[in-house]
Amino acid sequence: MTESNRLRIAIQKSGRLSTDSQQLLKSCGIKFSINEQRLIAHADNMPIDLLRVRDDDIPGLVMDGVVDLGIIGENVLEEEQIERQTLNKPAEFVKLRQLDFGACRLSLAVPSEFSYADASSLEGLRIATSYPNLLRRFMQQKGISYRDCMLKGSVEVAPRAGLADGICDLVSTGATLEANGLYETEVIYRSMACVIQSTQTQTPSKQALIDRILSRVNGVIRARESKYILLHAPTETLDQIVALLPGAENPTVLPLNDDTNRVAIHAVSTEDLFWDTMEELTALGASSILVMPIEKMMG
């Protein structure tokens, strides 16, 4: 491929999605090395360039066709979409799929001494946030007027510093809120990481590569969510044992050498196999039960 036909993927330079994004791409067979001093990393085995940028720059880069793909939190994507709708600015992208990492929620929080009944308790108060558009949409839907305080970071310290009465910020565990004397009152948006693609014209070779990558992403995530189960089972309780396997698709049943009363079962389960289920399998005569992770899946 020529330089202009190399696929450009934007990922977060640092932060909560950076490591998981890199690991996902490596699991898809894309070989690259990150130099912390450089914003671009070239794949060794595919015509792909990784652009390491601020997370809030990624949606715009994709929507404007500067890059072809982006891995981004849905919260940042939604914030940019609302901004562009407000400015009547085009947002040319498609969400290819949600990913299995980056879970968080955008929530309202207030100081521990604040008496909160519902969102109307914030009427007329000042709220600090890095997501003014998502906050405004929520408050407008509730019919609540407020004053905003736009901060790019350290939002949780705003009430203690006297900058705001409450905050609207990302929450994962709530530990940061607690450490700053705040408590969560209302979830206004739930988010996961996702893959987005620019809808500006792609060359056939680029689109083919995008399709390959998406197929691999799907396979990696399916593998993470699945387990490979092997066990020996008595033929007389075979149907009961198969019925117990969670989410199994048409397990493979094989005869055992020199044992006509037992068979081997191989199955891929898309649900967790809990200890209780394994004990039930054992009670039905199953033995040699193995539950193993799957690295890759396709088809």
Curated annotation (Swiss-Prot):
Biological process according to GO: L-histidine biosynthetic process
Pfam families attached to this UniProt entry: HisG, HisG_C
Pathway(s) served: Amino-acid biosynthesis; L-histidine biosynthesis; L-histidine from 5-phospho-alpha-D-ribose 1-diphosphate: step 1/9
GO MF annotations in UniProt: ATP binding; ATP phosphoribosyltransferase activity; magnesium ion binding
Catalytic activity line of the entry: 1-(5-phospho-beta-D-ribosyl)-ATP + diphosphate = 5-phospho-alpha-D-ribose 1-diphosphate + ATP
UniProt-listed Gene3D superfamilies: 3.30.70.120, Periplasmic binding protein-like II
Cofactor(s) needed by this chain: Mg(2+)
Subcellular location: Cytoplasm
One GO location term (cellular component): cytoplasm
Keywords, alphabetical: Amino-acid biosynthesis, ATP-binding, Cytoplasm, Glycosyltransferase, Histidine biosynthesis, Magnesium, Metal-binding, Nucleotide-binding, Transferase
Enzyme Commission number(s): 2.4.2.17
Role, per record: Catalyzes the condensation of ATP and 5-phosphoribose 1-diphosphate to form N'-(5'-phosphoribosyl)-ATP (PR-ATP). Has a crucial role in the pathway because the rate of histidine biosynthesis seems to be controlled primarily by regulation of HisG enzymatic activity.
Similarity annotation: Belongs to the ATP phosphoribosyltransferase family. Long subfamily.
PANTHER family: ATP PHOSPHORIBOSYLTRANSFERASE, ATP PHOSPHORIBOSYLTRANSFERASE ATP-PRTASE
Annotated protein name in UniProt: ATP phosphoribosyltransferase
Lineage: Bacteria, Pseudomonadati, Pseudomonadota, Gammaproteobacteria, Alteromonadales
Gene: hisG
